[in-house]
Amino acid sequence: MRFSLHLLPLLGGLHSLTEAKPLDQPSVTFLSPSEVSPGSAHNVIIEYGGSADGELTITYDSCDGAALVSSAKQRLGTTHVGDHPLAARHVDHDNRRPTKFVWLAPTDASELVGQSENLRVVKRIPRRSAKRSFAEVAGDDSMWFNGVAYLEQKEPDESFVAAAKSKSFGILGAGMSGLMSSLLLDSVGIHNWKILESSERLGGRFRTVYLNGTSPEEGQYHELGPMRFPVEITDSETNETFPFNDQRIVFQLADVLNELNAGNESVQVKFWEWIQSSPNAPVDSPFRRPDGTFPGKAEVATDPAYANPTVYHNTTAAAEAIAALDKFKGLDAERIRMYATNIFAAYTQAKEDGMFDYSEVSYLRDVIKTDLNTTDEVTPSHIYWPMWEYETVYFLATKWLTVKGGLSRLPAAFEPLMKGRIQYGAKVNGLHYNENKTVSVSWKPTGSEPFETPEEVESFDYVLNSVPLNLLKFWDLPPYSSLLKRAVDRTLFGNAVKVIVQFKTRFWEHLEKPIFGGCTRLTKPQLGQVCYPSWDLNATGPGTMLASYLSDYEATVACSMSEQEHLAYIKKALIRVHGDVVEENWTGNSARHCWEQDEHHAGAFTMQIFSQQDLYLPAFYQTQFNTVFIGEAATFTHTWTFSALESALRGTVQLLLDMGLVDEAKQITNTWMARFIEAALPPKPIYQTNNQINQTIEAIRNCQINNP
């Protein structure tokens, strides 16, 4: 909407090294912005029409009087351009004359502004009047496009001149956050980036294994990393279905990659249904069927003969403890909907409710004063974790999707976009901040002789670091702030081990009570999660299942066994579960991955203990020594693909704001950062491609043309 109709100009004041003289012709013409929002950040783009050497000051003032820099209403900033000695900082710009500047528009700019062209002032979404940190802006309302709170922390002239897009960018790690960052940089015309990846593959923890030399199309695979995406949830009482809005970014990414790779079927990303729960999947029970096999989920739920209620030493105390936890978490229908439709609002609510201040154990012991034995009985696996219940809500999903042919096909779709801008086998061991404000990255070839092999050193203007924090404990690092040092040193990572096994047939689909897809959890024997494939149902020939997925301490014990010893245990356990049909179909073809022993990760996922997350997160949201931290550890949810992608969005926007590239930061947030997160918006189709996505695709295509 329009406000009042007075005119206010943007003024460029140029002070030369010698006597100041009036200019016969304007040396500067203002090209943009065409409209502004009061109290928000904008880029001011100018064009030099003549000689411009000296101190340049840009101001904002009324058109009613003389255009005097000294009496201007607002000074945007001052820098030096052209032949001035202090203009050497702008060597990356043509003739040392930058053309893009940062303007934090005043909150009372309720008028039209402009000089050659009028600037239309538009109403923006109301914001809190109190100054907020970038972490707070990003954390609760996703309004990163504004950027004001972050830029206000900087000295005015420090953030005044926008950096040139020709700067160099190092991206450490080719997991999903690193890959996403490269895509985002390309989309805003920044192409001078390079990924350093310690392994020989893309995808990080995305790790699909195709057994026995098969192809994705043959279906003989399973996931040793992430497996699926929650899509929607149906309220069992109202029958209302609503989406997991945060997960839509995964499908939006697939849309963009598919369009960029149009015509190359081998890297198209397609989705099909994942079956998370199956009625006949075996469940933990002390009881057995007449044939000695484990009963299924539906049998245990409906047959009284399989009833096995939990027994507590003090039933009343246990019930009170469980009720206290449920009340504190408050996961009613309304809260579940908020978690699904607006994860940012859910995070804010969780902070306000104190969910990060306690684990289940500490809450019961310190607040409710529950006795130790009862506490231990009702909280078997929640000693350290905060009560941030997003994963609980994820697993209430009634519809799931996975990538056809395996999740590794998603990072594989980035391969055609690399264009030689990735160094595989580069194991980083340190960062050094130089006097010229560049960052040197030291690395050695992965697997090289450790004592005599010299280090390689590459320097970048900026670094996006997605390497798991626990690996950084052994790096040489710049003198980061105390908070960031502690975040690196003390953030914990959980262990996990997955084992997939190929069988001669899909025998589980031919049992008396057939199993079609689905996951279950078995602790006696110690298999953890077992997942039957959701694809190629009723197919002939061999089949592959996730035979064991253990995490935390159980994974540590399992990984202490040799792979063959562990496989023998799994075979024996599956025979107990399904009977001799396992022996009859056993091939021995298998794969195991112990994530804690993986030299590129040293852990499976972040496990920040209670009180750590809200303490450490702001440290990641501050750029230190031209380095921005991204990855699932550096965001407010963990372990899921969304976490990695969201961190890349935040980190790239943070970097662009550091560089003063406000327009580019807006472009990314308006394209990706989810107006669909707001619960008030109606659901969008999962595979929507809008004009903003098309603009992103076109920008990246231009990069491909310029980088053959």
Regions found by a protein language model. Give the residues of each.
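Active-site/ligand-binding neighborhood in enzyme catalytic cores
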Residues: 320-439, 445-450, 459, 466, ...
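N-terminal glycine-rich phosphate/pyrophosphate-binding loop and immediately adjacent elements
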Residues: 160-321
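Conserved flavin/dinucleotide-binding core of flavoenzymes
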Residues: 35-50, 60-68, 72-76, 86-88, ...
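Mid-domain catalytic core of redox enzymes
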Residues: 424-546, 550
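Fungal secretory targeting signals
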Residues: 1-22
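Short, compositionally biased P/S/T/A/G/V-rich stretches that sit at domain boundaries
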Residues: 17-42, 151-158
